[in-house]
Amino acid sequence: MIRSRQPLLDALGVDLPDELLSLALTHRSYAYENGGLPTNERLEFLGDAVLGLTITDALFHRHPDRSEGDLAKLRASVVNTQALADVARRLCAEGLGVHVLLGRGEANTGGADKSSILADGMESLLGAIYLQHGMEKAREVILRLFGPLLDAAPTLGAGLDWKTSLQELTAARGLGAPSYLVTSTGPDHDKEFTAVVVVMDSEYGSGVGRSKKEAEQKAAAAAWKALEVLDNAMPGKTSA
């Protein structure tokens, strides 16, 4: 039984015809198990282009002094599999994954929370919004959903990822290199990883993810923000 998709539409802030919404949510594994139904891959292709143009335009106007190379790096920090998957997980109270139509095998191996599937599903929804409502509505939805990522992009380091940014921050403050303690739970096909960042023998952030890399990135982001907040309390720092 397919659960109500209204919370998903409410989170997107648009209405979509049932047929178009179902297509946007149909993963190829489900299509193949059900007689070769159409998949969401064409919509994903379209949504990728709409997302890329919208983010590129936003960055171009937000950062008039940045070079082409810098803008490309900023865009890559916003438009990537992990960022898209994170937006998808926060899309509504239950996340996008529970609404994606998956084949039994994919569903049984944690496909509903697989970053690649969530990212593809997010792009296919954006493609569907563009088809139904046009570019301006698609742009409005994208800027609302990806606004926090656009805001955070300029704060990231040269590598445009949180681990690089944290390492640069701790080095600049003479705190040494951060270390990561990673644990995992669950069976091999459905593991959940938890990472904790340690700086100068103190824990500054933690993160949970479906992969070690994802958990470490989330932990690094939390630690970076914590260190920024505690700037004046860091060793070697004095209050103004």
UniProtKB/Swiss-Prot annotation:
Compartment(s) where it occurs, according to its Swiss-Prot or TrEMBL record: Cytoplasm
A GO term from the CC aspect: cytosol
GO biological process, one term: tRNA processing
PROSITE patterns with a match to the protein in the record: DS_RBD, RNASE_3_1, RNASE_3_2
Keywords: Cytoplasm, Endonuclease, Hydrolase, Magnesium, Metal-binding, mRNA processing, Nuclease, RNA-binding, rRNA processing, tRNA processing
GO molecular function, one term: metal ion binding
Pfam families: dsrm, Ribonucleas_3_3
Domain DRBM: 161-229
Ranges where the RNase III domain occurs: 19-134
Residues annotated to bind Mg(2+): 44, 120, 123
Cross-referenced CDD domains: DSRM_RNAse_III_family, RIBOc
Stored SMART domains: DSRM, RIBOc
Documented EC number(s): 3.1.26.3
SUPFAM superfamilies for the chain: dsRNA-binding domain-like, RNase III domain-like
Nucleotide-binding found in the keyword field: no
Catalytic EC class: hydrolase
Cofactor(s) listed: Mg(2+)
Active-site residue numbers: 48, 123
Catalytic activity: Endonucleolytic cleavage to 5'-phosphomonoester
HAMAP family linked to this entry: RNase_III
Other remarks on this protein: Was identified as a high-confidence drug target.
Subunit structure: Homodimer.
Family to which this protein belongs: Belongs to the ribonuclease III family.
Protein name: Ribonuclease 3
Organism: Mycobacterium tuberculosis (strain ATCC 25618 / H37Rv)
The organism's taxonomic lineage, starting at the top: Bacteria, Bacillati, Actinomycetota, Actinomycetes, Mycobacteriales
